[in-house]
Amino acid sequence: ASDVYKRQEINFPIFPIPNNIKDENEFEDITYIQGKSWISLQADDCKNIWDFFSVFSNEAFRYYLPAVIYISFEELIKFQKLKDSDILVDCTCQNMIGRMRDDLDIFRKFSFIQLQTIREWLLDLGEENSGLNPYDYKECVTWLSLLIEEKSIEAI
């Protein structure tokens, strides 16, 4: 987990911060996170943002996903388990598999390295910490593996 954690900041850009972060069909108030960079979010923010991933626009989902990875890796390294981020991780993983099933192109916008980081994060989390049932967890890891393979073929 620590290797991915250290590379995290390099793999995902901090700027630009997206302006339109809410899906147009959603009405929840997510001003708490508006204008904040993903790197500025900490474990204590989890109680305020755990349900935001379901209302995020695709752009905001891609932008803020590294925050969840960063926060959860920090906890796994420090406590050997998820602490404050457990519900945030569950909701994010549930939302991630839903978005994959709806539109895989959302994930094609991630780079090869970013996709590898997301997959490593899921594998390090393990099925029990992801909040996903075994089928959804395997499907999520498989989709990420296929997208990584697709990116590596494009690079040839």
Regions found by a protein language model. Name each.
Residues 13-16, 20, 80, 150-151:
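Short, flexible coil/linker elements and helix-boundary hinge sites characteristic
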Residues 62-156:
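Extended alpha-helical scaffolding segments
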Residues 1-5:
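Short, small-residue-biased leader/transition segments that mark boundaries at the very start
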Residues 15-55, 59:
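Short, contiguous, well-structured surface segments enriched in hydrophobic/aromatic residues
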